[in-house]
Regions:
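Membrane-interface helix-boundary signature
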Residues: 1-8, 49-59, 86-90, 111, ...
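N-terminal signal-anchor transmembrane alpha helix
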Residues: 3-35
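Core segments of transmembrane alpha-helices
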Residues: 15, 66-75
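A loop-to-helix transmembrane entry motif
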Residues: 32-35, 51-69
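Juxtamembrane helix-break-helix junctions at the cytosolic face
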Residues: 71-90
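Aromatic-anchored segments of alpha-helical transmembrane domains
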Residues: 97-105, 128-130
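Membrane-helix boundary connector in multi-pass membrane proteins
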Residues: 101-120, 138
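Membrane-water interface at the C-terminal end of transmembrane alpha helices
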Residues: 126-138
């Protein structure tokens, strides 16, 4: 169970750090979030209207703030519940991580699978963590 808790914590930690980096970047450094630079060329970014750029930035801020908040909540559930053998924590994590990773693939499909390797890696990490945690509980 502890191995699963650690692996899920790594998953959450990666999401937390990436979410914070992108959030700080969008708020303080660059007018275009990372996803814009993945999807659009520099020439295409230059042609975006301020309204379009503002909308993309707004969504990136909300999305990355949600990533950070979700990661913190996952860490709390892992170390308050799962690490102490609470079955509810495993079921909560199963539902939450499954939903989040499924939505990652849906979002990735919307941009032409440009972030597919990262989506696959994070999904595998979540699955491994859940399997080890489940084996430790049952």
């Amino acid at each position: 169970m502890l191995t699963g808790a650690i692996v899920i914590s790594v998953w959450a930690g990666i999401n937390l750090v990436m979410g914070l980096v992108v959030l700080v970047s969008v708020l303080l450094v660059t007018p275009h979030p990372l996803i814009s630079r993945i999807v659009f060329t520099e020439a295409e970014l230059a042609q975006l209207t301020p309204k379009t750029t503002g909308t993309i930035r707004s969504l990136a801020i909300l999305q990355n703030a949600s990533v950070v908040a979700s990661a913190v909540l996952v860490l709390v559930v892992v170390w308050v519940g799962l690490a102490h053998g609470e079955y509810w924590a495993w079921w909560t994590l199963l539902g939450t991580l499954t939903f989040l990773q499924a939505m990652q693939f849906a979002g990735d499909a919307a941009i032409g699978t440009k972030t597919l390797p990262a989506s696959v890696l994070m999904t595998l990490l979540a699955i491994v963590g859940l399997v080890f945690a489940g084996l430790g509980l049952w």
